[in-house]
Amino acid sequence: MKIANVLTLSFAAIIAASSLAVVVSPITDNSRETASSSISQSPPSQWSKKQLIEYCKKNSLKTSGSHEELVIRVQNHLRTASKKVDARP
């Protein structure tokens, strides 16, 4: 009977500790990275074609072409967009 009580208490402690860890840990979903977050962290030359097309759609740019053409289009857009921001008073 002592062994059963020790095992029961051990399992209860494990369950309590794991529940506490879940409650205390921040809730994040790192299982999938959004395109916008990965886009903001790397230069367009490292984006996937899907990410480039998504950026083009959001900014009303032409979405067809090779990966290299899309990279150039996005880089040009980013360059002109940053110039517009700098030119504002």
UniProtKB/Swiss-Prot annotation:
Pfam families registered for this protein in UniProt: SAP_new25
Domain of life according to the entry: Eukaryota
Ranges of residues in domain SAP: 44-78
Protein name: SAP domain-containing new25
